[in-house]
Amino acid sequence: MHFFNPPRYMHLAELIPANTTDPAVLEGLETFLTTTLGKGVVYAKDTPNFIGNRIGVFSILATIHHTHAFKLGFDEVDGLTGPLVGRPKSATFRTSDVVGLDTMAHVIKTMGDTLPDDPWHKYFIAPAWLGALISKGALGQKAGAGIFRKV
């Protein structure tokens, strides 16, 4: 099971069955997710980063690329990539802080390592500033500082 971030605001959850998963367990999980938590459920194959992270992290990486190319600031980009375009107010960089910068780096590395034939493979590289923040312990919301700092 994989929740989309931030889970309290995002409607979808992914269920990823293995070959040995009991269908009754999946049915029970889907029922719990839909009726108790009010989530929409998407079934996904067991592939690197499932559906949500493949699309979401690619979107973040593309945004990072364009942020650098157009010399934009993080606040400016989040102002453009949140509710203005139908996304959560956490937008791009704040969502990265919520997910955790260490988690982001792991997902990016997984994409780079496991998807060599993807046409966008050249973008599956964490920027140097991400590594610098992680090395300082600025892992995002869970550490009180990441791309943004809680004051």
Regions found by a protein language model. Give the residues of each.
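N-terminal glycine-rich phosphate-binding loop for ADP-containing cofactors
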Residues: 1-151
